[in-house]
Amino acid sequence: MDHYKSNISEVKKETVQVNGSKGAYIQWLITRENGAHYAVRKFTVEPSGIIPMHTHKYQETVVITKGKCKLCVANRVYEMKDNDYVFIDGDIKHAILNHDERLEFFCIIDYAGNMEIQATGEEC
């Protein structure tokens, strides 16, 4: 496939599957099925929602497009807002805790051999 065009509103919204997640949803916009070597995903996190501390083999870049949140990466804590972005290498623990308004962000990942996600059970 040499290109792919769609609209975010046409992509199914699924519940985030990290153990302990609350009020967090994902839409897979671009994937291997479109011929890409990477994936583009849109996340929506409801007020007070959470994607708890977890790790995975793949790298990711998170770009905040709406709202504010606390982002924990390794042993650092960042307050993120519109237009902030962060790169997180594979095998680095991280979590997102939303504040009091709807949070939206894009997350671009590569395809590692092992795509499993491991919740760590640690606090942010």
Residue ranges and their predicted role:
Residues 58-60, 64-69:
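Glycine- and acidic-residue-biased ligand/ion/polar-headgroup-sensing regions
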Residues 92-95:
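Short, charged beta-turn/beta-strand-edge "cap" motif at the junction between a beta-strand
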